């Protein structure tokens, strides 16, 4: 039940790690990302579990933790089940875009072993940033896409959407159908 889509990040991590082996870091910061050192089958790992929407603090927390793991060659397990980055101008002003770019660069630069477990939603830029791993494992029923449905249909069905009387409703209808299909 811990890996069910929408599960709290710490519950998703607890379903995979050895019992009572987790030492959480940065617990009071970036609450929608869980970061901990733990063991899996007796082997030390760094766990990053992302849930809900990620604000600039969540992204900064994950980035710092992955850099720490990489510095000591601790393998990183990333559990992805998130609705993406917080879509708000205030979060962007607070550094959301900069931190998201830093997170993507941190995962790309890390030379330690990286495993991404796609447990629920892994859509859009957050998928690209968090699932940049040596091995990706998708749980049955998860949603994986490099583009958000609205962005995908605006490219795939551009002419059809532009020809409609109501562009917004046509885009939303196509996006819903695309999300159900993919």
Predicted regions span which residues?
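Ligand-binding clefts of soluble mixed alpha/beta catalytic domains
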Residues: 1-182
């Amino acid at each position: 039940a811990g890996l069910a889509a929408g599960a709290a990040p710490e519950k998703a991590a607890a379903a995979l790690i050895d019992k009572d082996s987790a030492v959480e870091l940065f617990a009071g910061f970036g609450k929608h990302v869980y970061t901990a050192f733990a063991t899996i089958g007796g082997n030390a790992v760094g766990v990053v579990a992302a849930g809900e929407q990620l604000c600039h603090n969540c992204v900064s927390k994950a980035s710092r933790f992955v850099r720490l793991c990489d510095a000591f060659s601790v393998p990183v397990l990333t559990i992805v089940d998130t609705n993406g980055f917080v879509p708000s101008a205030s979060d962007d002003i607070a550094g959301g875009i900069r931190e998201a770019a830093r997170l993507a660069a941190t995962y790309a630069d890390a030379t330690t072993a990286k495993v991404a477990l796609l447990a629920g939603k892994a859509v859009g830029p957050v998928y690209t940033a968090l699932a940049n791993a040596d091995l990706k494992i998708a749980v049955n029923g998860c949603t994986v896409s490099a583009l958000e449905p609205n962005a995908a249909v605006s490219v795939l069905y551009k002419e059809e959407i532009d020809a409609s009387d109501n562009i917004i409703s046509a885009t939303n209808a196509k996006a819903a159908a695309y999300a159900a299909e993919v």
